[in-house]
């Protein structure tokens, strides 16, 4: 069973020529550091493989927090990150002039831009979990399908959510997809985030095959197509529909130290 609170972070290297350095710091020092924050149970990093809808940042980090109160979880995280730690390495400096970014809320403020450019730092609350999910380092999903969505302005939200819950059962009936969860936004620390995120775990990194099989599944799925509004438009706004491959499954053990 997945935790009810998810911290989702999307990033990209400020300088793609230094992508290896970006990943070395992120996987070797930063994620193991964050895993020592209160309530953290697991963290996984994924790299974008292909996008069917929208423009999606190339890196996704998922942090699972055993605290049902997302606000309290964030407060604990900020207090931890603002306290000194001898094993913590500062973010590598940008190439040239980095872009400053702002963290909202208490303990935040404007931060100097470094090699890691933050597109999204947000907390989500789980609304539904289906199938078999495992975020442990030894059995992390080899790939993900992630949907970034929101109800359309004039959608019947209750009806749409009921359909989406049914739709999730259809998705995980696809060969190669073992489980999934849907999350609703709780708060945004930095960047932009969609109201809902659907995360589906893949048993394979052959995302092209899974995408083809999913298309075949949904063509005859019992849940049918996306509901429409009274005007006939789609009741669901889709800002991103993307497949990822596992980049790393860090533990609390640092592999990169100052």
Task: Give names to the regions the model predicted.
Residues 1-258:
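Macromolecular interaction modules
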């Amino acid at each position: 069973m997945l935790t009810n609170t998810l911290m989702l972070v999307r990033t990209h290297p400020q300088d793609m020529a230094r992508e290896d350095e970006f990943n070395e710091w992120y996987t070797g020092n930063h994620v193991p550091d964050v895993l020592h924050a209160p309530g953290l149970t697991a963290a996984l990093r994924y790299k974008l493989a292909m996008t069917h809808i929208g423009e999606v940042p190339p890196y996704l980090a998922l942090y699972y927090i055993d605290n049902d109160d997302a606000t309290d979880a964030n407060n604990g995280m900020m207090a931890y990150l603002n306290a000194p730690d001898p094993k913590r390495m500062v973010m590598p400096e940008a190439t040239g002039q980095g872009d400053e970014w702002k963290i909202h809320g208490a303990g935040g403020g404007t931060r100097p831009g470094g090699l890691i450019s933050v597109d999204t730092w947000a907390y989500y609350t789980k609304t539904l979990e289906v199938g078999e999910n495992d975020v442990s380092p030894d059995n992390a999903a080899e790939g993900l399908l992630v949907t970034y969505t929101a109800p359309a302005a004039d959608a019947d939200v209750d009806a749409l959510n009921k359909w989406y819950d049914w739709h999730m059962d259809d998705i995980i009936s696809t060969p190669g997809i073992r489980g999934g969860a849907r999350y609703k936004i709780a708060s945004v620390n930095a960047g932009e985030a969609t109201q809902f995120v659907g995360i589906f775990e893949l048993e394979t990194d052959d995302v092209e095959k899974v995408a083809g099989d999913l298309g075949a599944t949904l063509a005859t799925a019992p849940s049918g197509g996306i509901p429409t509004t009274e005007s006939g438009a789609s009741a669901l706004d889709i800002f991103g529909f993307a497949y990822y491959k596992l980049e790393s499954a860090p533990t609390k053990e640092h592999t990169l130290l100052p």
